[in-house]
């Protein structure tokens, strides 16, 4: 089997240590978690004993890297002053929590411009990220900008948007990118065959730079190509399809990256079925 770091977004509702039991049963080599309930603004303190157990278990299971995903409510592109302020503070807090958990990355959605202009919205994200890095000056946690599907007023669905932000980040050692395959596809970057995959990642390399790519959110899409609709789907069963999903995880250019699945979890069989599919794909050879 090819040596690719794959894993899932793991639910922590049963506690941090329990989440790693789930990760182990799914053979995860890397994981993504929320550090708290993602549907609110409140931050319950991380319990010291739970954190210690989590870190010990991480070491035991050799799970790395760990990605902490920002909650759903923050919008670092928001024109609303109150929401923007809370979003920036959330980012700072999330970086501090990631550090406590020995997580390497904090993944953020670039956000929605609402009724603002694209340029204003992108500049807001730049300010938010620069502020958060400044406020966590001694941290090594890297902020990952995740591309979007371009749904509604979302920004960040074009590589040029991501480049605009990174160009204006003062400490470039603390910034990177997550590319979500479902979002790429919905935003008009084709991934269904070798030629399309090469074209998409060559374009990313030319505009943003592969050195900034730290993570792949490995999801099939339940919405059609260039639909600007964000709908994750089970691996190989969506519009990207079996061939595209297989080619993505066996593409040599991406083989050093963590592939994290954020596929639907409607039944207990969903994750194991997606795991099975990934393991089948990894029986193939890398291609270049």
Identify the meaning behind each predicted range.
Residues 60, 76-176:
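Active-site acidic/histidine proton-transfer and metal-coordination neighborhood
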Residues 21-28, 47-67, 94-102, 133-139, ...:
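Acidic (Asp/Glu)-rich catalytic clusters
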Residues 23, 69, 87, 98, ...:
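Conserved, mostly hydrophobic/aromatic
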Residues 1-70, 74-96, 284-288:
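N-terminal pre-domain/capping segments
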Residues 9-13, 36-38, 71-73, 111-113, ...:
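Active-site beta-loop-alpha junctions enriched in small/polar residues
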Residues 82-95, 118-131, 158-167, 195-202, ...:
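Short, electropositive alpha-helical surface patch
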Residues 131-233:
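Acidic/histidine-rich catalytic cores of soluble enzymes
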Residues 32, 214-217, 256-263:
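Conserved active-site loop/cleft motifs that coordinate metal ions or position small ligands
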